[in-house]
C-alpha cells in the first residue's frame, strides 16, 4: 500500500533523516520544483510572509536533508538572490560535513555581505554504519570555517559513552586541521520513547567532558509528530 500523506510516514526511531529522504519506496514525496515555486512555498510558511518581521526579528532559513550540499549548490545562489528573498539575513546549512563547497557557491558565500551563513556540522559516527574515513573529513570542515563571516559548530548525535569517545577523537582531528568551534551532543532518538532513554546520560556526559548539550526540543514540546 502506497503512503500518500507525508504525515502518515513512520517516524524513524533512532536516526535524524526522514523515510522520504532515504527509502526508495517513499521517493514520490521528493518532488522537484522550480526556484520560484520553492520561494512561494517558503513565504507561505512564514508568520508574516517575509523573512524580516515587523518587530525586527528575522526568520532563519535552514537547509537540511538528506545532505543539502550533495546536489543543489548551484541553485542555492539562485534561491538566495530571488527578489522575494531580499530580506533574508540568516541561513543555516545542516550538513554531515563530507561535501566540499563548489567553487561558484564558495565564491558567492565569500562575497555576499547580506546573508550570515552558519554551518551546523553533524558528522556521522560509527553507529550510523559509516566508516571513519568516509565520515570524518577535517579538510571539509576547514573549508566551511574559512568562509568569510561564517559561523560553524559541531553537533554529534550520541547514545552512550562509546559514542562520546568517538566524538573526542573526531574533535581532535578537526582541531588539528585548525577548526576550533563549539561542540554539541544531542541524544539519539527520533521518538520520545528512545529519546528519554538517552537524554539524562548524554547530559551528564556533556557535563563530564565539557561539551554543550543540545536537546530535541520538538520532541519535548510536541511528542511523536510530523511538522514540528
Regions found by a protein language model. Name each.
Residues 45-51, 55-58, 83-87, 142-152, ...:
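A structural motif corresponding to the C-terminal end of an alpha-helix
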Residues 66-68, 96-98, 124-126, 157-159, ...:
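Active-site beta-loop-alpha junctions enriched in small/polar residues
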Residues 160-228:
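Auxiliary Fe-S-binding modules of radical SAM enzymes
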Residues 71-72, 129, 163, 194:
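Secondary-structure boundary/capping motif
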Residues 35-42, 76-78, 134-141, 167-169, ...:
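Well-ordered, non-membrane alpha-helical segments in soluble/globular domains
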Residues 1-115:
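Conserved Radical SAM active-site core
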Amino acid at each position: 500500500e502506497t503512503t500518500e500523506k507525508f504525515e502518515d510516514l513512520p517516524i524513524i526511531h533512532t536516526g535524524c533523516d526522514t523515510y522520504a529522504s532515504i527509502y526508495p519506496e517513499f521517493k514520490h514525496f521528493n518532488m522537484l520544483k522550480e526556484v520560484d515555486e520553492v520561494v512561494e512555498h517558503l513565504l507561505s510558511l512564514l508568520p508574516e510572509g517575509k523573512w524580516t518581521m515587523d518587530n525586527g526579528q528575522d526568520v532563519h532559513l535552514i537547509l537540511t536533508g538528506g545532505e543539502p550540499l550533495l546536489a543543489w549548490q548551484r541553485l542555492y545562489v539562485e534561491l538566495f538572490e530571488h527578489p522575494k528573498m531580499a530580506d533574508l539575513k540568516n541561513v543555516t546549512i545542516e550538513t554531515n560535513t563530507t561535501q566540499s563547497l563548489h567553487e561558484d557557491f564558495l565564491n558567492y558565500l565569500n562575497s555576499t555581505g547580506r546573508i550570515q551563513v552558519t554551518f551546523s556540522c553533524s558528522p556521522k559516527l560509527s553507529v550510523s554504519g559509516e566508516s571513519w574515513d568516509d565520515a570524518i573529513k577535517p579538510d571539509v570542515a576547514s573549508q566551511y570555517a574559512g568562509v568569510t563571516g561564517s559561523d560553524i559548530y559541531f553537533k554529534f548525535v550520541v547514545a552512550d559513552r562509546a559514542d562520546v569517545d568517538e566524538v573526542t577523537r573526531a574533535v581532535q582531528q578537526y582541531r588539528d586541521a585548525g577548526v576550533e568551534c563549539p561542540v554539541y551532543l544531542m541524544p539519539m532518538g527520533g521518538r520520545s520513547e528512545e529519546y528519554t532513554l538517552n537524554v539524562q546520560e548524554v547530559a551528564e556526559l556533556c557535563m563530564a567532558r565539557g561539551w554543550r548539550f543540545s536537546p530535541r526540543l520538538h520532541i519535548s514540546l510536541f511528542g511523536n509528530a510530523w511538522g514540528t
